[in-house]
From Swiss-Prot:
Reaction(s) this enzyme catalyzes, per UniProt: D-glyceraldehyde 3-phosphate = dihydroxyacetone phosphate
Lineage start: Bacteria, Pseudomonadati, Pseudomonadota, Gammaproteobacteria, Chromatiales
Matches recorded under InterPro entries: Aldolase_TIM, TIM_sf, TrioseP_Isoase_bac/euk, Triosephosphate_isomerase, Triosephosphate_isomerase_AS
Organism: Halorhodospira halophila (strain DSM 244 / SL1)
GO function terms (MF aspect): triose-phosphate isomerase activity
Subcellular localization(s) per the UniProt record: Cytoplasm
Enzyme Commission number: 5.3.1.1
Function comment: Involved in the gluconeogenesis. Catalyzes stereospecifically the conversion of dihydroxyacetone phosphate (DHAP) to D-glyceraldehyde-3-phosphate (G3P).
Name of the protein in its database record: Triosephosphate isomerase
């Protein structure tokens, strides 16, 4: 059985006080699920020193380069040295706001994997792509770009997060059944291209506004193995409520 993962993506939010409050609440997170926190770069050191044992640290982005004259970039080896286990790559906001295409996302995935980090690859379709019935085409291309770059056993030891971009800030919501359908497609695509046993063990997280009041229903779906939590991860009580839903499921 796949172990569920609840990862908090703070985006460009948070401060030293939030690190302290989340660390205090995370001390109550004993359970079968894994808890991870991905704060902004300047808060990584504080989080690494304060998060209780068993709570993983992650970063929100990584450079595809190992070192060099790349002002503002942070390499995978630097994140590893800072105490990170996870790193998010290909988040919809990076793709949309900063023009990161599938090729660049694949490069970041490879860099993270080669350094010993666990990449959380984000995939998902926009509202226009959803309405044009291109969900599987778009998500498939995003997955294929990474599998083409890595070769065999691409997702061994990795994580995927499905972001229904069409249901974020659009007034439309994804039902648990709609989310499950895409998660099942992702697992099937990896099974076809990578390996069956890797696909069976691959954690696929839901990144579409999972909250305390809908977490249990989403996590009950057979191919939803946790959540990449945005806004709710900034509220320690809500974040731990989602974690508890995963740990008890």
């Amino acid at each position: 059985m796949r172990r569920k993962i609840i990862a908090g993506n703070w985006k460009m939010n948070g401060d030293q006080d939030l690190v302290r409050r989340v660390a205090e609440r995370a001390a109550d997170s004993a359970g079968d699920a894994e808890l991870a926190v991905c704060p902004p770069y300047p808060l990584l050191a504080a989080a690494a020193s304060q998060l209780p044992f068993g709570v993983a640290l992650g970063a929100q982005d990584v450079s595809e380069y190992d070192s060099g004259a790349y002002t503002g970039e942070v390499s995978a080896s630097m994140l590893l040295e800072a105490g990170c286990r996870y790193v998010i790559v290909g988040h919809s906001e990076r793709r949309t706001l900063y023009g990161e295409d599938n090729g660049r996302v694949a490069g970041k995935f490879v860099a993270a994997r080669n350094a010993g980090l666990t990449p959380i690859l984000c995939v998902g379709e926009t509202l226009a792509e959803r309405d044009a019935e291109r969900t599987e085409s778009v998500v498939g291309e995003q997955l294929d770009a990474v599998m083409d770059a890595v070769g065999g056993a691409t997702f061994q030891g990795a994580v995927i997060a499905y972001e229904p971009v069409w249901a974020i800030g659009t007034g439309r919501t994804a039902t648990p059944e709609q989310a499950q359908a895409v998660h099942a497609f992702i697992r099937q695509r990896v099974q076809e291209r990578d390996a069956g046993e890797i696909a069976d063990q691959l954690p696929i997280l839901y990144g579409g506004s999972m909250k305390a009041d809908n977490a249990a229903e989403l996590l009950a779906q057979p191919d939803i193995d946790g959540g990449l939590i945005g806004g709710a991860s900034l509220d320690p009580d809500s974040f731990l409520s989602i974690y508890n839903a995963a740990a008890e499921g």
